[in-house]
Amino acid sequence: MAAAAAAAGSSDSRKPAAHPPPRDFLVHVEAYLSRRDGVDKLLKISRYAARLALAAGPLPPAASARLKSFESSVGLSRKAFRLGKFVQNVNALRAHPHPPPAVALLAYGGEGVYYFLEQFVWLAKAGLLPAHLLPRLQRLSAWAELLGYVGSITIKLEEIGKLESSVKMRLKEGCREESDVVRTLRVKLLLKRMSVVQDVADAVMALGDVTDGKGLLGSSTLMASAGLLSALISAHKNWNSC
């Protein structure tokens, strides 16, 4: 009896884990929209879709004016959503052992400074702060954003290397490609690679801001495409995580 029970238990342990039932779509939408990042990424998609439409070709003057007004309004709305967001970067640095690694300081510190400065950019664009402060604030913000992405990409490339090593180790241990552990690692690897693509796209836009759109970085189609790609990847990640 004990042997049979053990065999049954062993057989049960080899069965693939049961997948949770699919979530109700509207409940999922509610959870997504209750997140600050969820709404922000929908606004980002809207903004860069409008920019891409403007860059794609000549539009009737009335339609072009409406799209430009919409794009500008959405951009200002997104900055309002960043109020206090720098606190998450402060907490991320606090979670690291002291002193934090240089690359973590670059990633979280750069992004934190960017979000902190963006609050003042928003106040200047909204008219509360003097308009003459805006160019300097935007330049400092763009540099902080770019440095943050350099650190973030570096960290994620290191994590990709570790995940690839873990997959190879599992396969050497006899795990098959279709096993749950390998499939889970493959999914994490894919998501991490997508995150790097997103950061590269955002870094290209930040570099365009830093260089005042000189050369290829002055292409409105390239910048709009990079922004839309980043927004879609981020929206996908947020949707899957909520």
Swiss-Prot record:
Question: Which tissue types show expression of this protein?
Answer: Expressed in seedlings, roots, leaf sheaths, spikelets and endosperm.
Short name of any one Pfam family annotated for the protein: PEX11
Q: What are this entry's molecular-function GO terms?
A: identical protein binding
Lineage start = Eukaryota, Viridiplantae, Streptophyta, Embryophyta, Tracheophyta
Q: InterPro entries from the xrefs?
A: PEX11
Upregulation details from the record are: By abscisic acid and H(2)O(2). Down-regulated by salt stress.
* Segments crossing the lipid bilayer: 103-123, 215-235
Which superkingdom is the protein from?
Eukaryota
Ranges in the topological domain labelled Cytoplasmic: 1-102, 236-242
What the record says about family reads: Belongs to the peroxin-11 family.
Q: Keywords assigned by UniProt?
A: Membrane, Peroxisome, Peroxisome biogenesis, Transmembrane, Transmembrane helix
| Reported function | Involved in peroxisomal proliferation.
Q: What is an annotated GO biological process for this record, any one?
A: regulation of peroxisome size
Q: Lumenal topology: which positions?
A: 124-214
**Location in or out of the cell:** Peroxisome membrane
PANTHER family membership:
PEROXIN 11, PEROXISOMAL BIOGENESIS FACTOR 11
Give the protein name, as stated in the record: Peroxisomal membrane protein 11-3
Q: GO CC annotation: what is one?
A: peroxisomal membrane
Q: Where is this region: Disordered?
A: 1-22
Q: State the gene name recorded for this protein.
A: PEX11-3
How does the entry describe its membrane topology? Multi-pass membrane protein
* UniProt keyword Transmembrane helix present: yes
